[in-house]
């Protein structure tokens, strides 16, 4: 199957003249639970089943892998239908958000901090990671970002074990979508991770997704927002920013870092 993440377009370089260039593809994806649409997000095609599973899990629509019976495309490549397992208990009305979200806004009125407090516990404090190892992980992510190398316009997320073993890498025009793809893949394969690395900044929704997925360490190449830091402290998540060039800032959870 050809790569659906990028497309070729005609441009004019100044100076230089007409040329062809690669750009990242951005298309809508409708996620349905049964016959009920629950979200439309702008994403980069690819790993759509992972995205749907990760979205439903991190928004607490489903609580576990066994809640999902099947995922398949429905009527078009831009519609995904999730069938729930018999006995799965979900509350679609609990999701207080706008129906549409854009590639730059994952939270956009979705689950609030109060809802997260009801559905999640603070993270366990049983993971220790070598700081030097953590500082090397953004380079490991970047080395696997094939679409970024081509376009320079796509976010990446990667899951690792505490020993630095790479588990998953996903790319998407939306940072929150890349994270959902990683978490959804882990969920569908009943796997777990200790560290999530993201290529850009860290906002509230990225911390929220880590808390729900029980990933205790979040490292980002960019900076976190004030709300991301507040949430990290409340749920005892280790939050690192500006992880590059052999250094970083630790905003919360420094107890998990070994010298």
Model region roles, listed by residue range:
Residues 175-259:
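Feature captures the catalytic cores and cofactor-binding loops of soluble hydro-lyases/lyases
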Residues 1-157, 161-162, 166-168, 173:
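Intrinsically disordered, low-complexity regions enriched in acidic/Ser/Thr/Pro/Gln residues
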């Amino acid at each position: 199957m050809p790569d659906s993440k990028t497309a070729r377009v005609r441009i004019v370089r100044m100076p230089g003249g007409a040329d062809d260039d690669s750009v990242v593809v951005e298309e809508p994806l409708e996620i349905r639970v049964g016959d009920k649409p629950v979200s439309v997000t702008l994403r980069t095609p690819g790993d759509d089943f992972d995205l749907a599973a990760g979205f439903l899990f991190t928004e607490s629509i489903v609580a576990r892998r066994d809640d999902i019976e099947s995922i398949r495309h429905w009527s078009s490549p831009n519609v995904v239908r999730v069938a729930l397992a018999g006995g799965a208990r979900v509350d679609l009305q609990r999701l207080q958000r706008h129906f549409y979200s854009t590639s730059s806004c994952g939270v956009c009125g979705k689950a609030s901090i109060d809802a997260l407090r009801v559905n999640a516990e603070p993270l366990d404090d049983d993971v220790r990671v070598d700081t030097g190892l953590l500082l090397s992980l953004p380079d490991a992510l970047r080395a696997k970002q094939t679409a970024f190398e081509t376009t320079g316009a796509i976010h990446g997320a990667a899951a690792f074990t505490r020993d630095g073993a790479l588990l998953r890498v996903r790319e998407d025009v939306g940072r929150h979508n890349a994270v959902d793809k990683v978490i959804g893949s882990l969920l569908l394969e009943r796997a777990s991770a200790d560290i999530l690395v993201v290529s850009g900044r860290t906002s509230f929704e990225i911390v929220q997704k880590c808390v729900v997925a029980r990933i205790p360490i979040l490292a980002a190449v960019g900076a976190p927002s004030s709300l991301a830091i507040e949430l990290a402290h409340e749920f005892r998540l280790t939050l690192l920013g500006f992880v590059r060039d052999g250094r970083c800032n630790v905003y919360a959870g420094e107890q998990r870092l070994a010298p």
